[in-house]
A protein has these predicted regions:
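Active-site cofactor/substrate anionic-group-binding motifs, chiefly glycine-
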Residues: 45-91
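Glycine-rich phosphate/ribose-binding loops and adjacent secondary-structure elements
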Residues: 159-161, 165-283
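Active-site-adjacent beta->alpha loops and helix N-cap segments on the catalytic face
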Residues: 65-68, 90-108, 120-125, 146-169, ...
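An N-cap/entry alpha-helix motif that binds or orients negatively charged groups
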Residues: 1-46, 50, 325-326, 331-333
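Hydrophobic faces of well-ordered beta-strands that scaffold small-molecule active sites
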Residues: 54-57, 82-87, 111-117, 136, ...
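C-terminal extensions of enzymes
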Residues: 1-13, 277-333
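Acidic (Asp/Glu)-rich catalytic clusters
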Residues: 44-48, 72-79, 101-109, 127-135, ...
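Conserved, mostly hydrophobic/aromatic
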Residues: 56, 77, 138, 200, ...
Length: 333
């Protein structure tokens, strides 16, 4: 089976041991100041304005199955006017005949599109991705633990910092440094800022686990690392001091509009969904997913109204209570 198809197969099977969003309770408002139709969902990040605060995050490509998922979700994104980010463009660079990425642009004129490349790649690979897909921005993903567990993974990482610096110097579209489900520490964000990165997708634990995926692909020797990393809520709590200095995108374990709003309350500029969208693509028609996503927009407005927040910025004024391991983490940072 194609490696990308194996990723899809095991991503669909995985269920996290816990979700940090369940450790967070928002304090509601009974007498709001705004009507529902006054609630503004728009957000700004990576030098772009988006009408809605959530998007379809990087997932797949590089196989027939990946192509069909990209095709379906790109159509959903276009019809719903939300952002769609492809998986790593490396697959297309390795195989010139691969059209699993091109199809999203070709079939969806005006699509809000981002794409993705690994930090192990030379900046010229990023330039090619930008040239081919003409995205609004380029994600640079860092996937250290995946590489370490992956049977055929890289063991050489000392060029990543230099590669990121060269991306910053040479790529003409905005850049986002992205984790892949293990979370991003304040030290990593500060290092990225020093290298010139302005936007970070912290992609915490709680959703897709590439440790689990690579364990299932291999001999499962490292199953004790399946829950490696920091949860999404823990990452956001740990990055409170960075919220006003850089742009933080939240992803990892986001299941529905309440999780989206919780991430925005903690200071995220926007929220990405991967595993949730993958499951929707696997189990629903394009029309059904469009209906679900359009409903999410209204549900986000409803929750914001119940929190007396007219816009995403005002969500940061919402009080909340933490429980369990997430509360313990918050007391020790």
């Amino acid at each position: 089976m194609n490696r990308k198809d194996e990723h899809i197969k095991y991503a669909l099977k995985y269920e996290s041991a816990g979700n940090s969003f369940d450790d967070m309770e928002l304090i509601q408002c009974s007498i709001p100041e705004y009507n529902l139709d006054e609630i503004d969902l728009s957000v700004n990040f990576a030098e772009n304005t988006f009408e809605y605060p959530f998007f379809i995050n990087a997932m797949t490509g590089g196989s027939k199955k990946g192509k069909e998922i990209n095709r379906k979700l790109a159509k959903v994104a276009k019809e719903c006017n939300i952002l769609f980010v492809t998986g790593s463009y490396s697959a297309a660079l390795k195989n010139p005949d691969d059209d699993s990425f091109e199809v999203v642009r070709k079939e969806n004129k005006g699509l809000l599109l981002g794409t993705n490349i690994g930090a192990d790649k030379n900046y010229t690979a990023g330039m090619k991705a930008v040239e081919d897909l003409k995205p609004l921005f380029l994600q640079i993903h860092v996937n250290l633990m995946q590489e370490l567990i992956m049977p055929e993974g890289s063991r050489n990482f000392n060029e990543w910092e230099k590669n990121i610096l060269n991306f910053v110097k040479n790529i003409k579209v905005p850049l986002i440094l992205k984790e892949i489900g293990f979370g991003m520490s304040p030290e990593t964000v500060k290092k990225g800022m020093e290298l010139g990165i302005k936007t970070f997708d912290i992609s915490g634990r709680g959703g897709t686990s590439f440790a689990y995926i690579e364990n299932m692909r291999g001999e499962n020797r490292f199953s004790y690392l399946n829950e490696w990393g920091q949860s999404t809520v823990s990452c956001l709590l740990g990055l409170k001091d960075c919220i006003d200095k850089t742009e933080i995108i939240a992803s990892g374990g986001v299941r529905h509009p309440l999780d989206i709003i919780k991430a925005l309350v903690l200071g995220a500029k926007a929220v990405g969904l991967s595993g949730t969208m993958l499951r929707l693509a696997e189990n629903n028609s394009t029309e059904e997913i469009i209906e679900i996503v359009n409903s999410w927009k209204e549900e986000c407005r409803m929750i914001m109204c119940a929190l007396n927040a007219k816009n995403v910025k005002e969500l940061q004024n919402v009080k909340y209570v933490l429980y369990g391991k997430t509360r313990e983490f918050s007391l020790n940072i």
